[in-house]
């Protein structure tokens, strides 16, 4: 936990990540902390991973998942299915469609899209280059030519995506990740992203957005096959929540045991298995071990996640470690598959939603089994995946959804707005702290209801009212936190609140939603 203290340590891109900059440049994953484009892109892209954005992505996720499941159904139970191959196709197609409106159509061709081939070769070579002496890399002319050719192809594909999107008329432009990168302005600086950085972000999202999630789904499949009792519980939950109908966005939050399975899978097999940090100044680790500024510390997640002082029987697959009544007992920094602090994975919600949908959909439609015995072999590049894992899948014969789980018919509402009330004019100030936009949207929704009930409402960021909270009327604060830190538009407010004498706030009527 000590090296995860962001007041003392920060992410470093020295070593392997420095070589990965050949592919991703100053994209979110490989950007250095002092590069302006990191903060700008992070602030600008946070709303693209908000709860409202996740709802918008859901139908496209279903589209791609259905392509995979339809192919399995048509191939039939006599055909062995390569799990990692199928999940790689699925996650690549999903991030491309949800994020950029592009279809790789991986399930309509036998070979992987050339983008995947180039990406895999480039990632493999980047890892090797980080372990070689510089002179070795310079002497390997043929290997270097292939490496540079693969990177050029990755960049050309993403540059073409940008070019095509810029040609679309405004009414034809989808609301997705790419459109946000092209059009949105950084709320702090007012600047937009340049095309080179957008290209780097596209490469980053296409690589990181599908590699890690495909590994998660592949390992989860393996662990379910090894633990049939867990698979039976998961299938029972899916039958109760989904029945034999199509998955809906609202189902995701109800698939609690599926979520536990995914989190326990990430404990045992974190698909991004390490991250590196460096001390900001010379320091002592654990009060004993001297570290100099610039030294590299590697946090190995498979070891961290198997600490016997935290996890009983750490090698055992037990999703109940993450049950609702147990998850709060897990010590901070004991489970970190998405990294640490402000440099943690921005796409965490996207990955978990996609994985929950896909795993539930597989269990809803199929009985799966292994055609032969399998000894786990892990393939490592930038991420971890099980190598050579195959399954067979037979369409299930469904039973009707239990009566208690059937949706209850409700009267049709002609309007979602409250009944108008006479205007009494009491001031209602809605203050929000929000990077992703979710808290701001909730504040504006409350304001709309307040107007209908006769209040005089105003909505503003928390920072606008640092030092001047009104004592007239009511103040409602709607805010989130990010890795223990205030949102960008609430920093000044938090600093003021920590220093202000308590007596000066007497008379302020307030409530906090957080």
Label every model-predicted segment.
Residues 156, 160, 245-286, 308:
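Conserved cytochrome P450 K-helix E-x-x-R motif and the immediately C-terminal K′/meander segment
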Residues 6-8, 299-327:
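Conserved cytochrome P450 K-helix/beta-meander segment immediately N-terminal to the heme-binding cysteine loop
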Residues 65, 69, 117-121, 239-247, ...:
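Cytochrome P450 proximal C-terminal region
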Residues 24-30, 203, 208, 246-250, ...:
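Cytochrome P450 heme-thiolate "Cys pocket" and heme-binding signature region
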Residues 1-57, 64, 82-83, 87-94, ...:
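Cytochrome P450 substrate-recognition site 1
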Residues 52-63, 73-97, 105-114, 136-157, ...:
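Cytochrome P450
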Residues 212-230, 235-237, 348-364:
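Cytochrome P450 catalytic-core helices
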Residues 50-52, 146-216, 250, 255, ...:
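Conserved cytochrome P450 catalytic core segment spanning the I/J/K helices
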